Amino acid sequence: MSEKSILLLNRTAPYGSHAARESLDIALTCGAFEFPVSLLFMDDGVFQLLGDHQPQSIGSKNLSASLAALAMYDVDQLFVCQASLAERGLSEADLALPATCVAAADIQSLIAKHTSVLSF
């Protein structure tokens, strides 16, 4: 772990708070400055990776554009907790973005590979 890196731990639903938007803003900023960043989606955070969000009905901006921009900024280290998907009746096929499924038992080692962790 000689190189500094950040893991953004996304645990909240995509709408209802600013947490998801703030996490994506940090990821895009890190990408713009070529700072190593990874995102882990777990708990209700897995809903951020689903397509066809329609937040206009609740007066929120759609996160889909920001999620799609991750690839343009070379932010491609996306992980999703397999257990969180299963608990919500979802599978990897439901995700709008490619993400590596991680077993709950392997999350601690994923966290340990990063020098900083920010939880949202």
What are these regions (language model features)?
Residues 5, 36-38, 77:
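Residues at the starts of beta-strands that form the adenosine-phosphate
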Residues 7-21, 53-54:
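Short, glycine-rich nucleotide/cofactor-binding loops
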Residues 20-39:
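Histidine-anchored nucleotide/phosphate-binding helix
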Residues 45-59:
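N-terminal beta-loop-helix "entrance" segment that forms/cooperates
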Residues 56-82:
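A glycine-rich helix N-cap at a beta->alpha junction
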Residues 78, 117-118:
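Short, well-ordered beta-strand core segments
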Residues 98-105:
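Short acidic-hydrophobic, aromatic-tinged amphipathic segments that line or gate anion-handling sites
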Residues 114:
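An anion/phosphate-binding loop that grips the pyrophosphate of nucleotide cofactors and donors
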